[in-house]
Amino acid sequence: MTEVVPSSALSEVSLRLLCHDDIDTVKHLCGDWFPIEYPDSWYRDITSNKKFFSLAATYRGAIVGMIVAEIKNRTKIHKEDGDILASSFSVDTQVAYILSLGVVKEFRKHGIGSLLLESLKDHISTTAQDHCKAIYLHVLTTNNTAINFYENRDFRQHHYLPYYYSIRGVLKDGFTYVLYINGGHPPWTILDYIQHLGSALANLSPCSIPHRIYRQAHSLLCSFLPWSSISTKGGIEYSRTM
């Protein structure tokens, strides 16, 4: 497609789900957009299997962009991304994985990519509601255009994945990027615990500080000395998650 795209193109863009008849078009587009070769079964799945959210952006009847994502339980996250969510979230907590997001070159920078991403968020809020806690994806470390797109929309780098991709027989590095939603968050680091403690102390009234410090110190002592016979009526019980 080589026509000049008007600045008002977004107002003429329509959205619809991909279907089996789109396979040839989607193959051609993915060949232009991505260096990875997908098997025919992948194209059949994303255009027919209801577990995928496969949305096309069309302009005057032609597909000019698409997003493919899967909403799944956190237990189905692959090992390399297993720590996307803190272990405190239940096993039926859901995540959304973006398999593909692309826009025809002439239509880039017209808001179509953002429209597709926002449509995925709307779909999540309708189907998964607040049970979905994160949206994540993988990207080549050299794909600065995509990285800037996601970072400008509040996605944050979570993992560096050496040799994650095999492109025409050459191994390439990747990143995992994550957007947390509905209160989702990664496992806490030591810095997070320190910041949480500082916030809690800032909210204490002066008169309660000595007693609370004693209780926290007692709890800490017991965690290091489980054989200790020290006891207190006001002791704190807590569990630690990793």
From Swiss-Prot:
<feature type="modified residue" description="N6-acetyllysine; by autocatalysis">
    <location>
        <position position="79"/>
    </location>
</feature>
<dbReference type="GO" id="GO:0120518">
    <property type="term" value="F:protein N-terminal-methionine acetyltransferase activity"/>
</dbReference>
<dbReference type="InterPro" id="IPR045141">
    <property type="entry name" value="NAA60-like"/>
</dbReference>
<feature type="binding site">
    <location>
        <begin position="101"/>
        <end position="103"/>
    </location>
    <ligand>
        <name>acetyl-CoA</name>
    </ligand>
</feature>
<feature type="active site">
    <location>
        <position position="138"/>
    </location>
</feature>
<feature type="modified residue" description="N6-acetyllysine; by autocatalysis">
    <location>
        <position position="121"/>
    </location>
</feature>
<keyword id="KW-0012">Acyltransferase</keyword>
<feature type="binding site">
    <location>
        <position position="143"/>
    </location>
    <ligand>
        <name>acetyl-CoA</name>
    </ligand>
</feature>
<protein>
    <recommendedName>
        <fullName>N-alpha-acetyltransferase 60</fullName>
        <ecNumber>2.3.1.259</ecNumber>
        <ecNumber>2.3.1.48</ecNumber>
    </recommendedName>
</protein>
<keyword id="KW-0159">Chromosome partition</keyword>
<keyword id="KW-0333">Golgi apparatus</keyword>
<dbReference type="InterPro" id="IPR016181">
    <property type="entry name" value="Acyl_CoA_acyltransferase"/>
</dbReference>
<feature type="binding site">
    <location>
        <begin position="150"/>
        <end position="153"/>
    </location>
    <ligand>
        <name>acetyl-CoA</name>
    </ligand>
</feature>
<comment type="similarity">
    <text>Belongs to the acetyltransferase family. NAA60 subfamily.</text>
</comment>
<feature type="binding site">
    <location>
        <position position="99"/>
    </location>
    <ligand>
        <name>substrate</name>
    </ligand>
</feature>
<feature type="binding site">
    <location>
        <begin position="109"/>
        <end position="114"/>
    </location>
    <ligand>
        <name>acetyl-CoA</name>
    </ligand>
</feature>
<keyword id="KW-0007">Acetylation</keyword>
<dbReference type="GO" id="GO:0006334">
    <property type="term" value="P:nucleosome assembly"/>
</dbReference>
<dbReference type="Pfam" id="PF00583">
    <property type="entry name" value="Acetyltransf_1"/>
</dbReference>
<feature type="topological domain" description="Cytoplasmic">
    <location>
        <begin position="1"/>
        <end position="192"/>
    </location>
</feature>
<keyword id="KW-0156">Chromatin regulator</keyword>
<keyword id="KW-0472">Membrane</keyword>
<feature type="modified residue" description="N6-acetyllysine; by autocatalysis">
    <location>
        <position position="105"/>
    </location>
</feature>
<dbReference type="GO" id="GO:0006474">
    <property type="term" value="P:N-terminal protein amino acid acetylation"/>
</dbReference>
<dbReference type="GO" id="GO:0017196">
    <property type="term" value="P:N-terminal peptidyl-methionine acetylation"/>
</dbReference>
<feature type="modified residue" description="N6-acetyllysine; by autocatalysis">
    <location>
        <position position="109"/>
    </location>
</feature>
<keyword id="KW-0808">Transferase</keyword>
<feature type="intramembrane region" description="Helical">
    <location>
        <begin position="193"/>
        <end position="236"/>
    </location>
</feature>
<comment type="function">
    <text>N-alpha-acetyltransferase that specifically mediates the acetylation of N-terminal residues of the transmembrane proteins, with a strong preference for N-termini facing the cytosol. Displays N-terminal acetyltransferase activity towards a range of N-terminal sequences including those starting with Met-Lys, Met-Val, Met-Ala and Met-Met. Required for normal chromosomal segregation during anaphase. May also show histone acetyltransferase activity; such results are however unclear in vivo and would require additional experimental evidences.</text>
</comment>
<comment type="subunit">
    <text>Monomer and homodimer; monomer in presence of substrate and homodimer in its absence.</text>
</comment>
<dbReference type="GO" id="GO:0007059">
    <property type="term" value="P:chromosome segregation"/>
</dbReference>
<dbReference type="GO" id="GO:0004596">
    <property type="term" value="F:protein-N-terminal amino-acid acetyltransferase activity"/>
</dbReference>
<feature type="region of interest" description="Required for homodimerization">
    <location>
        <begin position="162"/>
        <end position="173"/>
    </location>
</feature>
<dbReference type="GO" id="GO:0010485">
    <property type="term" value="F:histone H4 acetyltransferase activity"/>
</dbReference>
<dbReference type="InterPro" id="IPR000182">
    <property type="entry name" value="GNAT_dom"/>
</dbReference>
<dbReference type="GO" id="GO:0008283">
    <property type="term" value="P:cell population proliferation"/>
</dbReference>
<feature type="binding site">
    <location>
        <position position="38"/>
    </location>
    <ligand>
        <name>substrate</name>
    </ligand>
</feature>
<feature type="domain" description="N-acetyltransferase">
    <location>
        <begin position="13"/>
        <end position="182"/>
    </location>
</feature>
<feature type="binding site">
    <location>
        <position position="165"/>
    </location>
    <ligand>
        <name>substrate</name>
    </ligand>
</feature>
<feature type="active site">
    <location>
        <position position="97"/>
    </location>
</feature>
<dbReference type="GO" id="GO:0000139">
    <property type="term" value="C:Golgi membrane"/>
</dbReference>
<dbReference type="GO" id="GO:0042803">
    <property type="term" value="F:protein homodimerization activity"/>
</dbReference>
